[in-house]
């Protein structure tokens, strides 16, 4: 083993890491007398230490002010959702008026499709990737059926064309060109949840808009993971969850982006009173006057207690900056790839693309010997306090998150793989 693959080298990298102090801003689950080796921030991010104080602040305001907390106090609930707006916009590469924290991902996807999926007799198809996250597929199929359309004829899936189960841009481009005259909407992920493949959203937008289709994105595995430029890319809408890389807690409030070209449009929408312009909302007029931008798609008043942990996490993103986080992420995941290829190549096959521009922090791994061996390794890791996650039928996902993971965590993971293989 070369020095570059030694734990001593990893410890040196950790000592030189300019972001190392951010780890102390999170609460780690324990395994015996030590922190878990937590490599599953792609499923649920860790709790920011500041989250408890920010939740307590809301509880204290509720206890002392009651309903008046909507309009008075240190953080008025009427505008609490706007406390996370600017930081969210920086994370996704948007203008502040293009983003809002509301609802959850699947709810927001339905709201966006109600506005942006406008099928006609000639143009009614929706294009997605084969193997999309099930909730996305459920949403798409139900939207088609709500319009009286058959998913068998109006849902187009782009099949993986690479040996590792990923998609080439050529395959995506060919599908958009082939079905272009029929396409009403292209719904695409920033990162595919099972394989960890990242996509060139700007190019997908260019191809789809050239065919006259709208473009929406599911950014569940991209937001807070890779730099995004939604405004410049020209995406019509995007939705995401905030409980993975944005560390806002289980079942956290979601996020939504609507490009500013739609800010004052007359697009049909499913409306609610919190989407009404703020200045006249409490007049209780019967006519709906939408707030400009993404806030005009809000339905009900924001879940303030759920927004508080997101606010705590976004403070850390502003402190670090997405560029620095991405630079560390590329080094972490690159080091993990090196370790796997050097020490356990006979055990683990890397599904995720090798090029940093085509992945985020996650590596999706298949275990030699098939599903039974994969489950055996996964359970061994869990028992040893090394947490990744499992996605059927046969993938272990490992995600070194730059906010709180260390290079030495990757040695712990690979060391446990070696121990399992030797048993």
Swiss-Prot record:
Taxonomy, superkingdom: Bacteria
One GO biological process term: NAD biosynthetic process
Assigned EC number: 3.7.1.3
One cellular component (GO) term of this entry: cytoplasm
Binding positions (pyridoxal 5'-phosphate): 105-106, 133-136, 218, 221, 243, 273, 301
Cofactor(s) required for function per UniProt: pyridoxal 5'-phosphate
Pfam families noted in UniProt: KYNU_C
Function as written in the Swiss-Prot or TrEMBL entry: Catalyzes the cleavage of L-kynurenine (L-Kyn) and L-3-hydroxykynurenine (L-3OHKyn) into anthranilic acid (AA) and 3-hydroxyanthranilic acid (3-OHAA), respectively.
Identification of the protein by name: Kynureninase
């Amino acid at each position: 083993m070369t020095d570059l693959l030694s734990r001593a080298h990893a410890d040196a990298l950790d000592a030189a890491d300019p972001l190392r102090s951010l780890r102390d801003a999170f609460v780690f689950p324990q395994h015996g007398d030590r922190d878990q080796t937590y490599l599953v921030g792609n499923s649920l991010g860790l709790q920011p230490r500041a989250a408890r104080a920010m939740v307590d602040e809301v509880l204290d305001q509720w206890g002392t002010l009651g309903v008046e907390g909507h309009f008075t106090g240190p953080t008025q609930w009427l505008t609490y959702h706007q406390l996370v707006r600017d930081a969210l916009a920086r994370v996704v590469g948007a203008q502040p008026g293009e983003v809002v924290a509301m609802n959850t991902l699947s709810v927001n996807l339905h709201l966006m499709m109600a506005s942006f999926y406008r099928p006609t007799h000639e143009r009614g198809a929706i294009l997605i990737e084969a193997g999309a996250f099930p909730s996305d597929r459920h949403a798409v199929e139900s939207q088609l059926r709500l319009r009286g359309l058959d998913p068998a004829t109006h849902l187009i899936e782009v099949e993986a064309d690479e040996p590792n189960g990923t998609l080439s841009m050529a395959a995506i481009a060919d599908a958009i060109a082939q079905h272009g005259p029929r396409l009403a909407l292209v719904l695409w992920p920033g990162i595919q949840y099972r394989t960890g493949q990242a996509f060139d959203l700007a190019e997908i937008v260019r191809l789809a808009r050239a065919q006259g289709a709208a473009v929406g994105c599911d950014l569940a595995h991209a937001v807070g993971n890779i730099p995004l430029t939604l405004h410049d890319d020209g995406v019509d809408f995007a939705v995401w969850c905030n409980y993975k890389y944005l560390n806002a807690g289980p079942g956290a409030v979601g996020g939504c982006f609507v490009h500013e070209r739609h800010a004052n449009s007359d697009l049909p929408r499913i409306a609610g009173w919190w989407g009404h312009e703020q200045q006249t909302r409490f007049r209780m007029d019967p006519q709906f006057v939408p707030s400009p931008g993404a806030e005009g798609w809000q339905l009900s008043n924001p879940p303030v207690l759920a927004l508080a942990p997101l606010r705590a996490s976004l403070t850390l993103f502003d402190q670090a900056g997405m560029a620095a986080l991405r630079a560390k992420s590329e080094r972490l995941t690159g080091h993990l790839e090196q370790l796997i290829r050097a020490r356990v190549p006979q055990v683990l096959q890397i599904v995720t693309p090798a090029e940093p521009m085509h992945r985020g922090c996650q590596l999706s791994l298949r275990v030699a010997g098939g599903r039974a061996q994969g489950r055996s390794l996964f359970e061994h890791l869990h028992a040893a306090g090394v947490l990744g996650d499992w996605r059927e039928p046969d993938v272990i996902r490992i995600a070194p998150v730059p906010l709180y993971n260390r290079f030495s965590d990757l040695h712990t993971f690979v060391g446990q793989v070696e121990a399992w293989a030797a048993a």
